[in-house]
């Protein structure tokens, strides 16, 4: 089950890094208090660090290590005119390879929710997190 697996990995990482766990706990408590002690959709939407923690969990432990897509049109690989992906061909996108690329994610083995903050995301191409 994808949700329980993601949450299990998030809890594992938080157990290893108590400072991150404390920061998340403080955000949860403050946000719930701000929403009159009601845990609602709007309350969850205000938990920005929670979103970062879950996104980093999905980055480090992707449920689908690969994505499969079908080419909608012929595509010539830039710089390689003999490499053509024909319309209808299946293409494998290596999710884990993208998420563990040190050029995009320095220290990819490190659990670091800050790399998925709003400011950090603005500096990165949108296809660098799948």
For each feature predicted by the language model, list its residue ranges.
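Conserved cytochrome P450 K-helix E-x-x-R motif and the immediately C-terminal K′/meander segment
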Residues: 38-83, 102
């Amino acid at each position: 089950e994808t949700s329980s697996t993601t949450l299990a990995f998030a809890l594992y990482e938080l157990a290893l890094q108590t400072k991150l766990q404390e920061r998340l706990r403080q955000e949860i408590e403050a946000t719930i208090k701000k929403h009159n002690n009601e845990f609602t959709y709007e309350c969850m939407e205000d938990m920005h660090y929670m979103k970062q923690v879950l996104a980093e969990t999905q980055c480090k432990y992707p449920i689908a290590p690969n994505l499969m897509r079908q080419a909608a049109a012929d595509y010539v690989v830039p710089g390689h005119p003999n490499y053509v992906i024909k319309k209808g061909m299946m293409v494998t996108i290596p999710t884990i390879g993208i998420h563990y690329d040190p050029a995009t994610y320095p220290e990819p083995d490190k659990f670091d929710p800050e790399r998925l903050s709003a400011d950090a995301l603005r500096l990165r191409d949108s296809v660098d997190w799948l």
